[in-house]
Curated annotation (Swiss-Prot):
NCBIfam families cross-referenced by the UniProt entry: PRK00179.1
Main localization (coarse): cytoplasm
Compartmental location: Cytoplasm
Protein's name according to its UniProt entry: Glucose-6-phosphate isomerase
Organismal lineage: Bacteria, Pseudomonadati, Pseudomonadota, Alphaproteobacteria, Magnetococcales
Keywords in alphabetical order: Cytoplasm, Gluconeogenesis, Glycolysis, Isomerase
Biochemical pathway: Carbohydrate biosynthesis; gluconeogenesis; Carbohydrate degradation; glycolysis; D-glyceraldehyde 3-phosphate and glycerone phosphate from D-glucose: step 2/4
Length: 547
């Protein structure tokens, strides 16, 4: 048995759950006219409403006791202090330093990292402004019209999500594209229609050895060189890396290499040089506004008492829903089309961080950790998987996200969008009783056996937990707040679960086996070095390829 489930604070929550299993949220609202104000928090122009959860004041008090028992404040402070809280890799966790706007020193092993951060930011400012203004010329003397970011994982998902979310702030005439998949289709389709003379490639790989990224980078290089010659590489490629030797060997001028550090995890790296495509797309001031929003949430997280600390409260609500109410998944549902890549970004941020079954001291857990995260923009999801959220046997907590102001005030579109945003959380909470269904069916002219046969199908149990996040408008600043809110939520949950959210050993085994299999695919003859299924699949592939 792990120590977490033996804690008196954990067992007190278990007892509290048993005593309150029959609690209905609609009754809690009826009993407390101030429930919304009691269970909501605002930070700047971001409102977080968690009142539509199966919680009472006692639930929150007991969850906060658990957070204190797991030293959530201490782990938070150690992270901000630059201590090596990523123990398995012996590294500090300092994405917060990248957006530190206070000017105060942040140290790793006694060294203030802020001068190096500011130096790279200045380099990014100069380069992004040169590209945006047209001062940066390609080999033929033309300005850049298309930027292609080549990366994968954290070198792709964050920049893609932010660039899509901030499309209203993009510079006209300058397009940003992203290639991540080693499937040649991704690169081939991206290059279609691009003009080599006006295309800039950003190769994002800390080690400059990532298989997928370097495969795509060499394909892009071949495409460019075939049209413009070898000398063009220096004008049309830049690198986000720390491996100057490999960058230079590729043909990239190391003056155009943007560094970052091993205390920046990939899934937290959009704030670093990895964010260069963001700075080019929305301008460096927009990139800094993104940092400003994140910094505001950082300071709130760092200084607010636990009971009014938005990331802490959000994390504890998740602990309650997953570890005590039994939810295994979690939906992120942005009612904003610009946020259509948010769920994909958060899948990596959350599932790669907290998808662990071993604690920091190497013991197997006997409780659930990170949930399966999924999502789609509203209202698309309503016509897809919301049926399961409303009426299935599974409990699926959800975050609903929306902005009061739209960037595209077309007719009454936004009012209709937001009416669905508000309606869905109400429906999930209140449900619909059999008596209400009968009344509706009778009003529609249905009676007797036909009515009774339909009633069970139209009943909604309700009592489904949701959070609502409402911002005034999605800007670089408020997007920065939102991202940092999720980052710190993930951190707190990892600390409560006693796991390390900052390593990702689970991605290594498949990569190791792929390296072994790759030469087998081109070696003549059948393969017999794996299990029966894998051998059969490889040999079938080779037979079809040989036809």
């Amino acid at each position: 048995m792990s120590s977490l489930t033996q804690l008196p604070q954990w067992q007190a929550l278990q007892t509290h759950l048993e005593e309150n299993r029959s609690v209905q949220m609609r009754d809690l609202f009826d009993q407390d006219s101030q429930r919304f104000s009691r269970f909501s928090l605002q930070q700047g122009e971001l409102l977080f409403d968690y009142s539509k959860n199966r919680i009472t004041a006692e639930t929150m008090a007991r969850l906060l006791d658990l957070a204190r028992a797991q030293d959530v404040e201490g782990w938070r402070d150690r992270m901000f202090a630059g201590e090596a809280i990523n123990e398995t890799e012996g590294r500090a966790v300092l994405h917060v330093a990248l957006r530190n706007r206070s000017g105060r020193p942040i140290r790793v092993a006694g060294e203030d990292v802020m001068p190096a951060i500011n130096q790279v930011l200045q380099q990014m400012r100069q380069f992004s402004e040169a590209v945006r203004s047209g001062a940066w010329k390609g080999q033929s003397g033309q300005a850049i019209t298309d930027v292609v970011n080549i990366g994968i994982g954290g070198s792709d998902l964050g920049p893609v999500m932010v660039c899509e979310a901030l499309k209203p702030y993009h510079q006209p005439g300058l397009s940003v594209h992203f290639v991540s998949n080693v499937d040649g289709t991704h690169m081939a389709e991206t290059l279609k229609g691009l003009n080599a003379e006006t295309t800039l490639f950003i190769v994002a790989s800390k080690t400059f050895t990532t298989q997928e990224t370097l495969t795509n980078a060499h394909t892009a290089r071949d495409w460019l060189v075939a049209q413009l010659g070898e000398a063009a590489v220096r004008k049309h490629f830049v690198a986000l890396s720390t491996n100057a030797e490999a960058v230079s060997a590729f043909g990239i001028d190391t003056d155009n290499m943007f560094a970052f550090w091993n205390w920046v995890g990939g899934r937290y790296s959009l704030w670093s040089a990895i964010g260069l495509p963001i700075a080019i797309a929305v301008g460096f001031e927009g990139f800094m506004a993104l940092h400003d929003g994140a910094y505001a949430m950082d300071e709130h997280f760092r200084t607010a008492p636990l009971a009014s600390n938005m990331p802490v409260i959000k994390a504890l609500i998740g602990i309650w829903n997953h570890n005590f109410l039994g939810a295994e998944s979690f939906a992120v549902l942005p009612y904003d089309q610009y946020l259509h890549r948010l769920a994909a970004y958060l899948q990596q941020a959350d599932m790669e961080s907290n998808g662990k079954y071993v604690t920091r001291d190497g013991a197997r857990v006997d409780y659930t950790t990170g949930p399966v995260l999924f999502g789609e923009p509203g209202t698309n999801g309503q016509h897809s998987f919301y049926q399961l959220i409303h009426q299935s046997t599974r409990l699926v907590p959800a975050d609903f996200i929306a902005a009061a102001h739209t960037h595209n005030p077309v007719g009454d579109h936004h009012a209709k969008l937001l009416s669905n945003f508000f309606a869905q959380t109400e429906a999930l909470m209140t449900g619909k009783t059999a008596a209400q269904v009968r009344q509706e069916l009778e009003a529609a002219g249905l009676h007797g056996a036909a009515l009774e046969a339909l009633v069970p199908h139209k009943v909604f149990d309700g009592n489904r937990p949701t959070n609502s996040i409402l911002v005034r408008q999605f800007t670089p600043y408020t997007l920065g707040q939102l991202i940092a809110l999720y980052e710190h939520t993930i951190h707190v949950q990892g600390m409560v679960w006693g796991i390390n959210p900052y390593d990702q050993w689970g991605v290594e085994l498949g990569k190791q086996l792929a390296k072994k299999i790759l030469p087998e695919l081109t070696t003549p003859g059948e393969v017999h070095s794996h299990d029966g299924s894998t051998n059969g699949l490889i040999n079938h592939y080779k037979a079809w390829l040989a036809e």
